[in-house]
Amino acid sequence: MYKTKGGFQLTLQTLSLVVGFMAWSIIAPLMPFIKQDVNVTEGQISIILAIPVILGSVLRVPFGYLTNIVGAKWVFFTSFIVLLFPIFFLGQAQTPGMLMASGFFLGVGGAIFSVGVTSVPKYFPKEKVGLANGIYGMGNIGTAVSSFLAPPIAGIIGWQTTVRSYLIIIALFALIMFIFGDTQERKIKVPLMAQMKTLSKNYKLYYLSYWYFITFGAFVAFGIFLPNYLVNHFGIDKVDAGIRSGVFIALATFLRPIGGILGDKFNAVKVLMIDFVIMIIGAVILGISDHIALFTVGCLTISICAGIGNGLIFKLVPSYFSNEAGSANGIVSMMGGLGGFFPPLVITYVANLTGSSHLAFIFLAVFGCIALFTMRHLYQKEYGSLKHS
């Protein structure tokens, strides 16, 4: 089963996540083109870029729960059908309001993340769950696909036509999921309120949510603000900015399975502590950098640590919450998504207030330091002293 049905469903769901994230992230790499045709202020741009994260985060909880009730096939299929509408209207957008409304419903593409992290572990033994979820998480590469491909294509055929071309891809995957999705997936029908009551009493859920708020939040936030930030702050060409942003996203995505593998082989909490120490260093580098070379080093450091951290955290979630996996996955992934909503707004606010965005990156380092204290607390409660482990 693990080599046949499980492998096939892992591949299918990973590719579906790629498509979902392509749609979810389509606005950010095209914003340098969009703002040439649509009259938007920098403040409106920061809101437009952040809006898809809202629904993409909040829906992760019900999507995770529904996956255990009806199976991944039907949640993916329905999501793709729904995504056709905001993609179509985004291609017609002529006002900031139309961009915001379309972007809000594009959040469905980000919400499907919790579908696979709930479904995929059912097909694999416990010692392979970290790797399997890490591979599924590579579907985040859809964000990089949009960052790499959308700007050069938009330069040739225009941003509206580029957006509308996504309709074909999404419709195709709706059909593929309808035909090949697993109708025999194991269902777990624990009442939602019973799950929530159990989860609310477990401090580990709060810790994992906070950690993922930082790691996945950094992944999403940097993917959102980098294209526009690089153009405005460093004067980089629009296509080059998209490529640089794509490198950040791709690196974090491809390292996610490495985090899962490390979590399978070593103590995941201990590895995560090391990961966060390095991430804090990267955030400090960003907080003091005015040169593109140093800024690049800081970004790549954050990318590496965010990718590995994402994989480590979703090794821990199913191991701590086997009976409430769907809801726990949804809550943790929701917090990760929300972690990507606030930073672009904070960066814009801090830049307007102080004339520089450096302080916003220092905030990331502070949040990371707080996370280290919570990791130490969990480790000592679960495994004993760090000195004797």
UniProtKB/Swiss-Prot annotation:
InterPro entries: MFS (IPR011701), MFS_dom (IPR020846), MFS_trans_sf (IPR036259), NO3_transporter (IPR044772). SUPFAM superfamilies: MFS general substrate transporter. GO terms for molecular function: nitrate transmembrane transporter activity. Its main location: membrane. Pfam families: MFS_1 (PF07690). GO terms for biological process: nitrate assimilation. The keyword RNA-binding does not apply. The keyword Amino-acid biosynthesis does not apply. PROSITE patterns: MFS. It is a multi-pass membrane protein. It is found in: Cell membrane. GO terms for cellular component: plasma membrane. Keywords: Cell membrane, Membrane, Nitrate assimilation, Transmembrane, Transmembrane helix, Transport. Induction: Positively regulated by the two-component system NreB/NreC. The chain crosses the membrane at residues 14-34, 45-65, 69-89, 97-117, 139-159, 161-181, 211-231, 246-266, 268-288, 294-314, 331-351, 353-373. Belongs to the major facilitator superfamily. Nitrate/nitrite porter (TC 2.A.1.8) family. Probably required for nitrate uptake under anoxic conditions. Also possibly involved in excretion of nitrite produced by the dissimilatory reduction of nitrate. This is Probable nitrate transporter NarT. It comes from Staphylococcus aureus (strain MRSA252). The gene is narT.
